[in-house]
From Swiss-Prot:
Coiled-coil intervals, chain numbering: none
GO biological process: one example: mismatch repair
One GO MF term: mismatched DNA binding
Organism of this sequence: Staphylococcus aureus (strain NCTC 8325 / PS 47)
The name this protein goes by in its record: DNA mismatch repair protein MutS
UniProt cross-references to SMART domains, sorted A to Z: MUTSac, MUTSd
CDD domains reported in the protein's UniProt record: ABC_MutS1 (cd03284)
NCBIfam families: mutS1, PRK05399.1
Gene: mutS
Database matches in Gene3D superfamilies: 1.10.1420.10, DNA repair protein MutS, domain I, MutS, connector domain, P-loop containing nucleotide triphosphate hydrolases
Keywords of this entry: ATP-binding, DNA damage, DNA repair, DNA-binding, Nucleotide-binding
Family stated for the protein in its record: Belongs to the DNA mismatch repair MutS family.
Role this protein plays: This protein is involved in the repair of mismatches in DNA. It is possible that it carries out the mismatch recognition step. This protein has a weak ATPase activity.
């Protein structure tokens, strides 16, 4: 440290306090970065990496960005998962002797971005915390940009992961280290996990008497937010407690497979349910819509209340169109209020706020003309006339972006300001008159009076006009020489400059003070503005539901008391939209308490997956309170939706396609109830034919005898189609296709009964496989059919009465048969004694205590995976 300059000593001291951040260290007009920070930042930002003290033995790596354009660089770093500590000069270098005092004024993290361009208008920017006291877990989350703050608690890790998936935070804060397995699961949502073991002594306004663990989670979250932001956050609302069980549950895989908010292939909004349903006109409405998709309701009363409003908007087209026009003039009130509280609001933001609240009376009057018994929100709308008057009387309609350059306030708003502005205006008039007079006096037509911040006002004469000109004769004093001109001042000009600049400086300083006062006045309306924003966002969502219902010919769903699902001429809303409406083939579906399993067969590409997905998506839309793409729709209210669709390795945790498939199936089989919906697509294809067939049958039997969940189960195992003889709750259906002159024609129509052909070779022909491969496959298929018969039998897989578990006899497997090729020596080498020592390890004890006779194959596989993870 002895060879380090005082400035670098200051840098190193501050950096030591923010080791997990990139430190933006203010030096004049730049933010500089040094050492490893500089290397990282230069790589990510693609800026030049240079060196400080380049001639010394150990030069310091450094890079920098201009302070006036720093926001875009910070956004880039934060979007790449970095935290940025902003260190400012707290004193004016011109007025400070010695080292300028510097300190970190804010830490920008992925979950605390507040700048207008740093967050997506249509997405919440959540930061989440959770604390664990097994078996109990409490979780709290906040959007700092809007002020939303919520908390909940539960007793299982599965719900924790479901909540994290639903909330989709950009940052997670914890108070202790977590298992690698849990960390991997969270990293599927966000890479930024912050461990904050030590909290400040500050106690935030959270009720700690209701629930200790929820208080701790919220306290942890708010402490971290205040630690990073270091300023007023009064816009953060009082914490709202909710219960996860009040909403339909869907895990990460269900939301991904159904493509609710992000498409699997493009990883974008386009092609998703959110994309389809978003006819909102405000950013607040768009964010609310995503929340509603992520959390469908399970309260029939709440669902029907939303549907009643959609009915009202659907029946009043003209009023709805007018409402959309009004909403189009409403800006993002939630985030505008957040910036007011945060202190980074500008005058243009307040003009946007003014325009937004000026639409509230129009919206209220419009809703008053409709059914007020249905539109309960009309009574909650509050025209903020007092705030509107304040903003109307104060700010000019088109103020500058900066609040420190003047030009913000109307004439007549403040008497003192008017006097300063008048003096400045008169001074500039005098300057214009002086310029005309000097041109006439000197005879130089190009003479001009200009200004810069270094020299103030001056008279400029080009060098061509100086040949026969004697400055002293006119009282001119040389101020600056340029290559093509000379600049002069006069006593008269200098005297007037002091008056003009003095008035301008005083006006700008006063305007900033007045703006701060105005900002504080607007801050008093925070709670009322947030309430209006919530109402407007809900109305925006509901009019959007009515808009798409009319545009795409949707119908109002009804909900059965006897848990029947009956869809008449149902369509997949997204697939229908991207293709010609008239080309889409609608299908029916009926599941009830007697028949609650559809076993779906049919060739690849025939539409089995689309059919299953559309049933799930229609259920989600209905429980959001939206119309659905059906001619008629009667639905139960589902508590959960489980899916197993598609093939995907979990590369992060090293799980194979089959293992992922089994884990997802395990969740459905373990947690599904008779009020759940299960979508299983081609279960068992990731293993051998007989293993897959056995597992598929076992799962169907388990659902039929245990959970009774409504289930759509597609398969290519045609042997399973005879299960309807043993399972009254199962019905065979198929997606029809015809073969005409060797060509396969997909009808996309779901019909009763099983299909007797997979048409695999015909599908391969559609994919333009080489003709030689197709011909050879047909020969091999003929040989198989000749030797084994067209239809296989599942006689070896018959159910055992009253025996839901699969044992060795059910599977018709023999340990002796599978091991007869192994020698005794092979067995001796493989069968080492796990329990040789008196002192047993925890994992050894777990293995020893397993009751294998009472475990299904899936449970055994999942348990083995858990033990493997513990050993990693």
């Amino acid at each position: 440290m002895s060879n380090v300059t005082p400035m670098m000593q200051q840098y190193l001291k501050i950096k030591s306090e923010y080791q997990d951040c990139l430190l933006f260290f203010r030096l004049g007009d730049f933010y500089e970065m040094f050492y490893e920070d500089a290397k990282e930042a230069s790589r990510v930002l693609e800026i030049t990496l240079t060196k400080r003290d380049a001639k010394k033995e150990n030069p310091i790596p450094m890079c920098g960005v201009p302070y006036h354009s720093a926001d875009s660089y910070i956004d880039t770093l934060v979007n790449n998962g970095y935290k940025v500590a902003i260190c400012e000069q707290m004193e004016d270098p011109k007025q400070t002797k010695g080292m300028v005092r510097r300190e970190v004024v804010r830490i920008v993290t992925p979950g605390t971005v507040m700048e207008q361009g740093g967050v997506d208008d249509k997405q919440n920017n959540y930061i989440l915390s959770f604390v664990m006291n097994q078996p109990e877990i409490a979780l709290s989350y906040c959007d700092v940009s809007t002020g939303e703050l919520k908390v909940t608690h539960f007793n299982d890790e599965a719900t924790l992961l479901n909540e994290i998936t639903t909330i989709n935070p950009n940052e997670v804060v914890i108070n202790d280290n977590i298992s690698d397995n849990l960390k991997r699961q969270i990293n599927m949502v966000t890479e930024t996990i912050t461990v904050r073991e030590t909290l400040s002594s500050e106690i935030y306004s959270v009720n700690q008497t209701e629930h200790k663990l929820m208080y701790q989670a919220t306290q942890l979250l708010l402490d971290y937010i205040h630690h990073t932001q270091k300023r007023d956050l009064s816009h953060i609302e009082d914490v709202v407690q909710y219960a996860a069980i009040d909403y339909m549950k869907m895990d990460f895989y269900a939301k991904r497979n159904l493509e609710l908010t992000e498409s699997i292939r493009l990883k974008s909004k386009k092609g998703t349910l959110l994309w389809l349903m978003d006819e909102t006109k405000t950013p607040m409405g768009a964010r609310r819509l995503k929340q509603w998709i992520d959390r469908p309701l399970i309260s029939k009363e709440q669902i029907e209340a939303r549907l009643d409003i959609v009915d009202e908007f659907s029946a009043h087209f003209i009023e709805r169109d007018t409402l959309r026009t009004y909403l189009n003039q409403v800006y993002d009130i939630e985030r505008l209020v957040g910036r007011v509280s945060y202190g980074n609001v500008n005058a243009r933001d307040l003009i946007q706020l003014k325009h937004s609240i000026s639409e509230i009376p129009n919206i209220k009057a419009l809703l008053n003309s409709m059914n007020q018994n249905t539109l309960v929100q009309v009574n909650q709308l509050e025209p903020l006339d007092d705030l509107l008057d304040i903003l109307e009387q104060s700010l000019v309609e088109e103020p500058p972006i900066s609040v420190k350059d003047g030009g913000l306030f109307k004439v007549g708003f403040n008497t003192q300001l008017d006097e300063y502005l008048e003096a400045s205006k008169n001074g500039k008039t005098w300057l214009a008159e002086l310029q005309a007079k000097e041109r006439q006096r000197t005879g130089i037509k190009s003479l001009k009076i200009s200004f810069n911040k270094v020299f103030g006002y001056f008279i400029e004469i080009t060098r061509a006009n100086l040949q026969n000109f004697e400055p002293s004769e006119f009282g001119y004093m040389r101020k600056q020489t340029l290559s093509n001109a000379e600049r002069f001042i006069t006593d008269e000009l200098k005297e007037k400059e002091d008056i003009i600049l003095g008035a301008e400086d005083k006006a700008i300083e006063l305007e900033y003070q007045l703006f701060v006062q105005l900002r504080e006045e607007v801050k008093k309306y925070t709670e009322r503005l947030q309430q209006q924003a919530k109402i407007i966002s809900e109305l925006d969502c509901l009019q959007s539901f009515a808009e798409i219902a009319q545009k795409y010919n949707y119908t109002r769903p009804s909900f059965s008391e006897n848990k029947t699902l009956e869809l008449v001429e149902s369509r997949h809303p997204v697939v229908e939209r991207v293709m010609d409406y008239n080309d889409y083939v609608p299908n029916n579906c009926r599941l009830d308490n007697e028949t609650f399993i559809y076993l779906i067969t049919g060739p690849n590409m025939s539409g089995k997956s689309t059919y299953m997905r559309q049933v799930a998506i229609i259920s989600i839309m209905a429980q959001m309170g939206a119309y659905v793409p059906c001619k008629e729709a009667v639905l139960p209210i589902f508590d959960q939706i489980f899916t197993r669709i598609g093939a995907a390795d979990d590369l992060v945790s090293g799980k194979s396609t089959f293992m992922v498939e089994m884990l997802e199936a395990q969740k459905a089989l373990t947690y599904a109830t008779e009020d759940s919906l299960i979508i299983f697509d081609e279960i068992g294809r990731g293993t051998s034919t007989y293993d897959g067939l056995a597992l598929a049958q076992a799962m169907i039997e388990y659902v039929a005898e245990t959970s009774h969940a409504k289930t759509l189960f597609s398969t290519h195992y045609h042997e399973l189609t005879t299960l309807d003889q043993a399972l009254p709750s199962l019905k065979n259906v198929h997606v029809a296709a015809n073969e005409y002159k060797g060509e396969l024609i997909f009808l996309h129509k779901v019909k009763d009964g099983a299909v007797d052909d997979s048409y695999g070779i015909q599908v391969a022909k559609l994919a333009d496989l080489p003709e030689k491969v197709i011909s050879r496959a047909q020969v091999i298929l003929s040989e198989f059919e000749a030797s084994a018969g067209k239809k296989s039998s599942i006689s070896n897989l018959k159910m055992v009465e009253n025996e839901p578990e699969i044992n060795q006899e059910n599977l018709n497997l023999s340990v002796e048969e599978t091991t007869d090729t192994l020698s005794q020596k092979d067995f001796e080498q493989a069968s080492f004694d796990l329990f040789e020592n008196d002192q047993k390890s925890e994992i050894e004890l777990q293995i020893k205590n397993l009751n294998l006779s009472n475990m299904t194959p899936i449970e055994a596989l999942v348990k083995l995976s858990e033990l493997q993870n513990q050993l990693k």
